[in-house]
Design a protein with these regions (language model features):
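A bilobed periplasmic-binding-protein/Venus flytrap-type ligand-binding module shared by bacterial periplasmic
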Residues: 115-122, 158-159, 251-263
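Hydrophobic residues within well-ordered alpha-helices
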Residues: 41, 209-211, 257
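Extracytoplasmic/periplasmic substrate-recognition and gating elements
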Residues: 220, 224, 231-269
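Short helix-loop capping/hinge motifs at secondary-structure junctions, enriched
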Residues: 122-129, 161-168, 261-267
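Early extracytoplasmic/lumenal segment of secretory-pathway proteins
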Residues: 1-64
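Hinge/lid segment of periplasmic solute-binding proteins
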Residues: 38, 59-111, 125-130
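Alpha-to-beta junction loops
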Residues: 43-52, 66-68, 139-141, 212-220
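Ligand-binding pocket segment of bilobal, Venus flytrap-like solute-binding proteins
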Residues: 142-148, 152-156, 164-240
Length: 269
């Protein structure tokens, strides 16, 4: 529910009518994880007009011909794509499928990292920086993991290959995109070993548990971490966030129009 400013949702119908002369109602729905949204569209043919999945889901939707190209020539609102960070633009371009450019199907919205949110009273920065400490028995039942397959898989496969990363034999990007049976088995093994330390798999309740001191570390997204740090500070709890020194996932979210959309015009706006 924190993903879009409520004022934007409230003001959009009025702005849309100014632009088009047409009335519209915004029905806003959120999903805990990307895969739930994808299943509703792919199998249930849900007629969402516009959705905002992460980069790996966008890539999959383009590959499966599930998206409509976006008409960028509309209204009086300038398209910000030409001013996009070169780094983000390069990363987005990697998701293109053959002659299908990702920028024809997606508009970048947010980006960030996956890392460790930690309580500075009980966890040092040095401990938070090392992936190995998420497996440390010292933190038995004191760690939350984001309920995200890609991020948990990434953490586990990076940790399993940390020596190879240090030697320069493999990159984090290569590991994140390796879905071989061997790599999946390695990640599964590491996640099983981590199980005694896991207090829960969270989609949205991590901020509350960290603020109340029920857990000490949360492997989460940078956006959620910032929100949690601000909320915790209001009640005198000091939290901080770091990206593991071994490396981690960089995520991108973007707006796309599913092919089952009923109001493509409004979705483009």
């Amino acid at each position: 529910a924190d993903y879009i400013d409520e004022d934007v949702l409230a003001e959009f119908p009025e702005w849309y009518k100014e632009q088009t002369g047409e009335d519209i109602e915004v029905i806003y729905q959120v999903f805990d994880i990307n895969e739930v949204m994808l299943t509703k569209i792919e199998r249930g043919h849900e007629d969402f007009d516009v959705v905002c999945p992460s980069e790996y889901i966008i890539e999959r939707m383009i590959r499966k011909d599930m998206l409509l190209p976006i008409n960028r020539d509309f209204g009086n609102t300038p398209d910000y794509i030409p001013n996009l960070s070169p780094y983000i633009q390069d990363e987005l371009n990697k998701m293109s499928q053959g002659d299908k450019k990702v920028t024809d199907y997606a508009v970048a919205y947010m980006w960030g990292t996956a890392g460790t949110l930690y309580n500075t009273e009980v966890v040092t920065e040095e401990e938070a920086l090392e992936c190995a400490n998420l497996w440390n028995p010292k933190f038995n039942n004191k760690i939350l993991m984001k309920d995200s397959y890609r991020d948990c898989y990434g953490l586990a496969i990076i940790y399993a290959n940390k020596d190879r990363i240090e030697k320069g034999e493999v990159t984090v990007e290569q590991l994140m995109n390796d879905n071989s049976h061997e790599s999946i088995a390695k990640a599964e093994e590491q996640l099983k070993l981590m199980k005694p330390n896991i207090a829960g798999w969270e989609a949205d309740f991590g901020k509350e548990m960290m603020t109340k001191g029920k857990v000490w570390m949360n492997f989460t997204w940078s956006g959620d971490a910032v929100w949690a740090i601000e909320e915790a500070a209001e009640v005198g709890v000091e939290l901080d966030y770091v990206v593991p020194i071994e490396g981690s996932n960089v995520w991108f979210d973007g707006w796309v129009i599913p092919k089952y959309a009923r109001n493509v015009k409004a979705a483009s706006y």
